[in-house]
């Protein structure tokens, strides 16, 4: 019995010391919770909220939430969002998947230790290759938007149009993208062209 306990503790220690343990636990838990315990969201464009709180492990040297933690929290919230609106299920049905192809973050005010917040995630639209999502970090103390993150979720194995059609059982036209999002997409395309030219891969497209 003692040997089993020692082995279990050793495995747990190795899991959290050698791997990003909490992330590997939280994302599947968020997906399972969204799938089994939360109601389905039928409106693809509806905003969803994911609650969080700044913990000591989230802090940087200035005692603010570490910039990288915003991306992680948004990752967990995005997984739950795509589960509840059915996108992950549709991708599975179509033998397809998505990868994160681009992201950007704008930080407006720091989140401090033990400050409660919500991640407001919404799908802004899609094109022939990717879904575009926005995540807002809203302080529950005063409702201030502390950070705004944007993501390009590239679809592999099918197209966003087919995913949406599979979900809605009909053809759905993508919504008009916001002007600032169009500028960001244009920036990504220009950056890709420059990098391909530098690498001599001008005929190859990025994800």
Curated annotation (Swiss-Prot):
Alphabetical keyword list: Glycoprotein, Phosphoprotein, Secreted, Signal
Cited SUPFAM superfamilies: Thioesterase/thiol ester dehydrase-isomerase
A Pfam family hit: 4HBT_2
Residues with Phosphoserine modification: 199
Gene3D superfamilies (alphabetical): Hotdog Thioesterase
Signal peptide boundaries: 1-21
Name recorded for this polypeptide: Protein THEM6
Major subcellular location class: secreted
InterPro entries: HotDog_dom_sf, THEM6_lcsJ_thioesterase
GO CC term (a single one): extracellular region
Species this chain originates from: Mus musculus
Location(s) in or outside the cell: Secreted
CDD domains: 4HBT
Family that this chain belongs to: Belongs to the THEM6 family.
Glycosylation positions in this chain: 188
